[in-house]
C-alpha cells in the first residue's frame, strides 16, 4: 500500500469558499482537504465545481463518520463509496478520527476510545479492514476529548502508537487537539508529541478553538490559530 506525502499548507474545502477560490487560489495553498461524507451524493452545479478543483489541485479526504473505535460493524457501503469517490477524483489519501461516533445510530459527535490493549486490537483490526477495502494506507487523527474513559492501561500517546503499529497505518497529527487536550487534562503538549511515531505523520491540522467561561477549551475549528499552537 503506497504512502502519500503532502507538502506546503492546505485549506479545508467548503462550498461557501468556492466563489472566492474560483477567482484564484492563493499560491500559499498547496492542497485542499474535504469531508467525503459531505460530497458523496452531491450532484449538479456543486459536483461540477468540485470536479473543476480536483482536476487542478491535490486533495485529501478527511472522514467524519467511519466509527473506527465503535462496536457496530464497519459501514462497508460507506467505505466502498469513499473508495469510488477517491478514484473518481484522483485523491490518494484518506484520514479518519481515532474515536467512536455511533452504536445503534449516529451520535454526531466524536468520543474517545478507552486506552486499553483490547481496544488497540479491536480498533487496529477495523483500520486494517478499511485499508484492505480501499487498497491503500489510511491515516488516523488524534481526537480531542473532554472526559477521559476509565480503565486506561496505556497513556493516550502510548495507545495511539500501539494502534498505528498494530494496524500499520499513518498518523494525521492534529496539533490543536493536542493543545486542547493538554490544557483540559493537564499534560505537557510537547512531551506528548515527542512520544508519537512522527515518522508516520502524513500531514497536520492547525486550527482554532473556543474557551468556555469556566476555562474549558472546546475544539471548534472556528477561530484563529493561537501562537502556542503554532509553536
Which residues does each predicted region cover?
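Gly/Pro-rich active-site loop or hairpin
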Residues: 41-43, 73, 110-120, 181-231
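Active-site acidic/histidine proton-transfer and metal-coordination neighborhood
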Residues: 75-171
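Active-site beta-loop-alpha junctions enriched in small/polar residues
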Residues: 14-16, 34-39, 64-67, 98-99, ...
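Acidic-and-aromatic substrate-binding clefts and catalytic sites of carbohydrate-active enzymes
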Residues: 18-19, 36-46, 67-77, 146-154, ...
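Acidic (Asp/Glu)-rich catalytic clusters
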Residues: 21-27, 44-61, 77-92, 128-133, ...
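Conserved, mostly hydrophobic/aromatic
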Residues: 32, 94, 138, 174, ...
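Boundary/entry segment of secreted carbohydrate-active catalytic domains
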Residues: 1-21
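Conserved radical SAM core fold
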Residues: 67-68, 101-107, 210-217
Amino acid at each position: 500500500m503506497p504512502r502519500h506525502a503532502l507538502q506546503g499548507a492546505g485549506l479545508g474545502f467548503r462550498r461557501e469558499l468556492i466563489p472566492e477560490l474560483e477567482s484564484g487560489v492563493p499560491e500559499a495553498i498547496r492542497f485542499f482537504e474535504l469531508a467525503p461524507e459531505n460530497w458523496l451524493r452531491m450532484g449538479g452545479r456543486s459536483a461540477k465545481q468540485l470536479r473543476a478543483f480536483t482536476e487542478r489541485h491535490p486533495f485529501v479526504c478527511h472522514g467524519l463518520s467511519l466509527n473506527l473505535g465503535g462496536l457496530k460493524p464497519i459501514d462497508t457501503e460507506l467505505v466502498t463509496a469513499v473508495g469510488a469517490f477517491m478514484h473518481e477524483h484522483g485523491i490518494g489519501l484518506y484520514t479518519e478520527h481515532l474515536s467512536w461516533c455511533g452504536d445503534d445510530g449516529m451520535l454526531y459527535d466524536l468520543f474517545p476510545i478507552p486506552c486499553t490493549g483490547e481496544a488497540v486490537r479491536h480498533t487496529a483490526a477495523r483500520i486494517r479492514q478499511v485499508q484492505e477495502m480501499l487498497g491503500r494506507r489510511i491515516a488516523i487523527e488524534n481526537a480531542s476529548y473532554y472526559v477521559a474513559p476509565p480503565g486506561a492501561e496505556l497513556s493516550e500517546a502510548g495507545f495511539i502508537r500501539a494502534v498505528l503499529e498494530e494496524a500499520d497505518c499513518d498518523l494525521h497529527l492534529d496539533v490543536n487537539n493536542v493543545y486542547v487536550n493538554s490544557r483540559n487534562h493537564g499534560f505537557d503538549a510537547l512531551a506528548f508529541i515527542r512520544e508519537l511515531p512522527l515518522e508516520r505523520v502524513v500531514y497536520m491540522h492547525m486550527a482554532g478553538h473556543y474557551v468556555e467561561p469556566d476555562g474549558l477549551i472546546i475544539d471548534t475549528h472556528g477561530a484563529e490559530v493561537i501562537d502556542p499552537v503554532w509553536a
